[in-house]
Amino acid sequence: MDDRNEIPQDGPASMEPEGVIESTWHEVYDNFDDMNLREELLRGIYGYGFEKPSAIQQRAIIPCVRGRDVIAQAQSGTGKTATFSIAILQQIDTSIRECQALILAPTRELATQIQRVVMALGEYMKVHSHACIGGTNVREDARILESGCHVVVGTPGRVYDMINRKVLRTQYIKLFVLDEADEMLSRGFKDQIQDVFKMLPPDVQVILLSATMPPDVLEVSRCFMRDPVSILVKKEELTLEGIKQFYVNVKQENWKLGTLCDLYDTLSITQSVIFCNTRRKVDQLTQEMSIHNFTVSAMHGDMEQRDREVIMKQFRSGSSRVLITTDLLARGIDVQQVSLVINYDLPSNRENYIHRIGRGGRFGRKGVAINFITDDDRRILKDIEQFYHTTIEEMPANIADLI
């Protein structure tokens, strides 16, 4: 059985998180060679740029490889995707052209990214993996799945559809991974996940991963799992180290645009992400920034899948430097060069705050998060500070020196 987690695009030079690890699994492996992994998988790991396992990888890969159900919680950017990807690749039998591992992710972008990681780590293994996501051609999806893929990564709706059509065969699946479990088990996906789960073999191994795991999610997850190993980062450590957090007082909503333009006139920014709470606001802000001669890209869930992929590609390559988006991007998308995250709107759900600001400091990279605060937002800001045991200070005049 296998397990798999989220891995960034560059090597893990500074991957060791500062966070406190609590674990019911006490074996710790501080290098990949001691994990008794396949030779061709090790080649893929080192070829991908990894030198040593991160804290979560040191603890979670082996119980996953040994077939245990695992609840793993770690900060965004600590190598979660690699954790379950490595465990999956260690366990699959590539001589059987059937789906042996099924990974669900909350967004198409995250599913696509995970699939890329599996293919990269499994480069020397003749592994077949497919991203089964909405917004793509159903017939083509069905054709690829019918021909057999060892690892399928997808969004819940499309995966359920493909199982129903009998083109995604489930009888060989030995591992079921839920990435970003808090989001996946939230109201929107809970029923779909349960529908998929019911169609899997009864002895399937289950892995749940997320940056945040509220008690109710842990409770729900236990319905799926047998005697799971828990590997958790203490909640107060979850605000990412290396991210400087500030707020800017903006008296009224309609003053935000001027404040944003002033910021961009002042700062020299490699790349930045601006979060708004609604798709409409994303479109509106994109239009207003363009009128003020700022070059920006926008992405949200109303867009065609092809358009979203083009925008993400441009942003990853650096040809687009400012991306305005909703929480669609907040979960798990690796964009390595992001130096600044701006919460144009504070997230309506405090759980999303860490997913948003985690965009700026993956793998120990330094980053700055700036929150625009109206008078109505003060209570929400206070709530976020208390929830994460953190302090968000007023933005200093020398902000340019910090980015």
Curated annotation (Swiss-Prot):
Domain of life of the source: Eukaryota
EC numbers listed for it are 3.6.4.13
Motif Q motif positions after renumbering to this chain: 30-58
Binding site residues for ATP:
74-81
* Start and end residues of each Helicase C-terminal domain: 242-403
Alphabetically sorted, this entry's keywords are: ATP-binding, Cytoplasm, Helicase, Hydrolase, Initiation factor, Nucleotide-binding, Protein biosynthesis, RNA-binding
Task: State its location(s).
Answer: Cytoplasm; Cytoplasm, Cytoplasmic ribonucleoprotein granule
- GO process terms (BP): cytoplasmic translational initiation; female germ-line stem cell asymmetric division; germ-line stem cell population maintenance; mitotic cell cycle; negative regulation of BMP signaling pathway; oogenesis; pole cell formation; positive regulation of proteasomal ubiquitin-dependent protein catabolic process
> Main role?
ATP-dependent RNA helicase which is a subunit of the eIF4F complex involved in cap recognition and is required for mRNA binding to ribosome. In the current model of translation initiation, eIF4A unwinds RNA secondary structures in the 5'-UTR of mRNAs which is necessary to allow efficient binding of the small ribosomal subunit, and subsequent scanning for the initiator codon. As a result, promotes cell proliferation and growth. Binds and antagonises the bam-bgcn complex; probably prevents bam mediated translational repression of shg/E-cadherin. Involved in germ cell formation.
**Name of protein:** Eukaryotic initiation factor 4A
